[in-house]
Amino acid sequence: MNREVYNTILARRSIRSFTDKKVSHEDIRTLLEAAMAAPSACNLQPWSFIVVDAQDRLAALYDCAEQGKYYAPLAIIICGTNSHIPWKDDGWLFDIGACAENIMLECVELGLASVCIGGFDEARLSEIFSIPEGVRPVCILEIGYPAWERKPNSWYTEDAVHWQIYDTDRERKMRTLEDLHEDIKNGQM
């Protein structure tokens, strides 16, 4: 059995420390091709991308981030719109998530690292990057070469899995921000 995809999935980690080495335009195009290969409802492809690799534009972007200022040499702002979608729910956000995951997985294949940022000032980011009304910046992917390597890891936990019905007698301990900060302090993130 070929386990390449599974191994890539486990190797994908949120890296928060990058070298200064630039990502080539060829690799950026490969990342965007992977992104656009993501599934989307009715193949409506609600995404668009702003590639940011100029230092002054990166500085402006990081000023919009509430957290997650990791100063990678490349950022991709993934934007989306549902203006062309006949139903008006938030399902298109799943399409954007699949798109982002494809980029993060392809980063692993290219020897790059990434972290997905969802906490930012949406209005300010839209203004700075001339994002038109009706288009939303959904997430920012910071991408670069990792400053250090992390081992692949499975976060599988049996208590997150329910069979046939949701078993309310089982209690799952959810991870907290304190857990994240402890992991960072211990060099695990």
Regions inferred by a protein language model and the residue ranges of each:
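Acidic, surface-exposed loops and disordered segments
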Residues: 1-189
